[in-house]
Design a protein with these regions (language model features):
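C-terminal alpha-helical interaction module
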Residues: 1-130
Length: 130
């Protein structure tokens, strides 16, 4: 999944804003040093990065086109937990949706959220799609 880096870069400022107050200075300084720009500069280029992230999820969409309910087939497996968990984590901190409302990944993410008695629906999430 080549969507990981563009998604993370799109939401670094959101991660900062969700961090504990005592951790924010360290988070900001270390990420700005690592990335070579301010968190605000990263946030200003979010739209382009989200386009790249959506394109990077195409392999996930293609896998699901085979008709199986999960990436691993009839039952959820490692890929479903890793990719689904990452996308749901992003949704927990993202202040802007990262998928479009017609994205076929939304049905799959719904199935991932329903696992373990709907545990994925019990965590507060921001809008995943717009």
């Amino acid at each position: 999944m080549s969507a990981g880096r563009p998604l993370l870069l799109s939401y670094v400022k959101d991660i900062h804003d969700h961090a504990l107050e005592r951790d924010r200075d360290y988070f900001r300084q270390s990420r700005e040093k690592l990335l070579g720009c301010t968190l605000e500069e990263l946030a200003s280029a979010r739209a382009e990065r989200l386009d790249a992230a959506r394109a990077g999820l195409e392999s996930v969409r293609l896998t699901l086109k085979g008709g199986a309910p999960f990436l691993s087939g009839a039952h959820p497996g490692f890929a479903d937990y890793m990719v689904g968990g990452f996308l749901l984590w992003v949704a927990s901190i993202a202040t802007a949706p990262f998928l479009t409302s017609d994205d076929p990944l939304l049905d799959w993410l719904g199935r991932v959220q329903d696992l373990y008695g709907g545990l994925g629906r019990k965590s507060p999430l921001n809008a995943i799609a717009a």
